[in-house]
Amino acid sequence: MAVSKFTLHNAPTTGGSNEAAVVFPWNTPKKAVNPYLDPAEVAPESALSNLIALYAADNEQEQLRRETLSDEVWERYFFNESRDPVQREIEQDRLISHAKTAREQQRFNPDLVIIADVGAQPAHISKPLLERIKYFHSLGRAKAYSRYLRETIRPCLERLERVRDSQVSASFRFMASHDGLEGLLVLPEMNQDQVKRLSTLVAAHMSMCLDAACGDLFVSDDVKPEEIRQAWERVAAEAMRLEVIPPAFEQLRRKKRRRKPVPYELIPPSLARMLCADWWCRKLWQMRCEWREEQLRAVCLVNKKASPYVSYEAVIHKREQRRKSLEFFRSHELINEDGDTLDMEDVVNASNSNPAHRRNEMMACVKGLELIAEMRGDCAVFYTITCPSRFHATLNNGRPNPKWTSATVRQSSDYLVDTFAAFRKAMHKTGLRWYGVRVAEPHHDGTVHWHLLCFMRKKDRRSITALLRKFAIREDREELGTNTGPRFKSELINPRKGTPTSYIAKYISKNIDGRGLAKEISKETGRPLRDSAEHVSAWASLHRVQQFRFFGIPGRQAYRELRLLAGQAARVQGERKAGAPVLDNPRLDAVLAAADAGCFATYIMKQGGVLVPRKHHLVRTAYELNDEPSAYGDHGIRIYGIWSPIAEGKICTHAMKWKKVRKAVDVQEAAADQGACAPWTRGNNCPLAENLNQQEKDKSADGGTRTDITRMDDKELHDYLYSMSKKDRRELAARLRLVKPKRRKDYKQRITDHQHQQLVYELKSRGFDGSEKEVDLLLRGGSIPSGAGLRIFYRNQRLKEDDKWRNQY
């Protein structure tokens, strides 16, 4: 049978049949695919495939358009400083946190994440923390290193974030959202120049607020004082957003029940201050230093293990401030209308600004209280009051305190002041009275605590002590249990062990200049009390803490004015008989004589005695307004002299009006002092050393002789040096600079590797490089200048700081 459309092949038969197998298109054998030899088969285009491709292209274009629009909107509203820089920073912080989380998941090492978080902090936080981390890592103890990161560094970073949140409020962030004020958010990271520029912008913003307020309120030419006060209120509200109290705020603010009329004359000077860039610079710089110090407390950089009482940065700033003040005093003098001049440095050193004079006056006052207590038969009790644990940032071992609530040093001081005020009110209600002195000093982490030396009747001692203990431990009472010693201590002073003055002498000295405490070691910090006096002074200046306060006695300012009056009278009277009366009234003259003799006990009794209200004191300080207005247009108050309610008129003790002027400088001497840096003149501008060498050659040629000071004894050398002129002293100082001091190369202290690492770490923590050159210099008996005339030296495996370092050699 013939088949025309099919191809026949020989195929095996089935069931004995001879029929041939027919091959159809659907079962034709396929050819093997070789992608290297055969060309790629292209699918045939169809209407459906073309439609799908068009839809895909439209979707891609729409997605690109939406992304572009989203980026434009995001950049317009969030990445534009003129819109909302705060939101931009929040978004950046969120992205950074996401990146950190991703890295943490990838690395799976929490220690590296902690180190990365530390590195992301500002330099004043990250640098000292990284130095500590590096030191712990160099010890080679992996478990202790990891435990230090997790138990110390991580809580420190968490506390740092809480402190920052408490510092920057919502209103403060709102102020930072204005044009040019973004720097307020990073105020603790700024230096002094940056704060000056920021203060200029803040003053400009206040000026614009005042212009806007005047435009809204002053609708007519006849402006009323109340409308001016409302304009002041708007500017003051802007200042309050920055957590700065406006000047004269209490007198000018709105009150429901005002007893006195509104002092509208205080509005112009208040506005002048709020519109002044210099005034804002002082306020912002003070805020910057306080915020920065609280951040350093949060990361445990202020404690006895690192820097007691206050950070090293604050100590260095205080030294620099003192150095600038000394330079200012030395370059100025005081002159009066008659042409008489006084050296300003001598005047400052002779005043109560001198720490030695301030210490002597307080010790004399305490001695006077002691004599009065003996005369009255009163007993003396020594109290110590401490803040609750929520005010303490660091434990005694240097680790973070888990109970700390981000309370500042200033808040701890305010807590003690409020507690003392409440106790005094309750004591007066019960008819109990006392008098004495209190000393405010810091713990190792900067928290304030008080020491009180109080005199009272013996029958009232138990009642006063119980009442004071009640108020001292009433907050957070549950954390004390049965032991109230950590919060309150009282000790009845036993005359057999020591006098009340001897009890308080150490606390007065170590909070002023450390005089007489060179060998005393602090039980809290383990350091000499004399070395810690500088830290305490910087702490009190930074946090504005009043260190000393006398209560229950007449004021000491009247005592100073009486002594000044006695000195003036002695100069006027000349050779008048000693003991002659100065004042006509015998009662007032007795007070003046007691003050002139320096006997506080007699002075207090002649004034009326202890526990006497101020209105009954015989002599009080008189004040008056300044003749010349200040830079802000107001007349400040200054001391006039003394006055008494039993006598008419006032006695002036400041009759002379003194002006401070810059000292006149001799141009030739100034040029000679500057040497090669002197400006071009017609004289010789060679360096000073060359001039001196030439002068010595001329003297030798003329046959002149040079005095040999090496053969003089101490008295002859003293007389010779004090008889030299200023020019001869400068020449001698220049010759001494040319002579290189001899070094003892054979002397070197031997220390272990661990002590070497500790020395390097402590040098770096104080702001030095900690290089081998510095370490070798210290080990060979040398010293490194640290500012304000002090030097650092290494003795007995301890780094010390003193201006008498050669005495330790």
UniProtKB/Swiss-Prot annotation:
UniProtKB keywords: DNA replication, Endonuclease, Hydrolase, Nuclease
Biological processes per GO annotation: DNA replication
Domain of life: Bacteria
Enzyme class: hydrolase
EC number: 3.1.-.-
GO MF: endonuclease activity
Keyword hit for DNA damage: no
Pfam families in UniProt: Phage_GPA
Active site: Y503 (o-(5'-phospho-dna)-tyrosine intermediate), Y507 (o-(5'-phospho-dna)-tyrosine intermediate)
Cross-referenced InterPro entries: Replication_gene_A-like (IPR008766)
Family that this chain belongs to: Belongs to the phage GPA family.
Function: Possible endonuclease which induces a single-strand cut and initiates DNA replication.
Protein name from the UniProt record: Probable replication endonuclease from prophage-like region
Organism: Salmonella typhimurium (strain LT2 / SGSC1412 / ATCC 700720)
Organismal lineage: Bacteria, Pseudomonadati, Pseudomonadota, Gammaproteobacteria, Enterobacterales
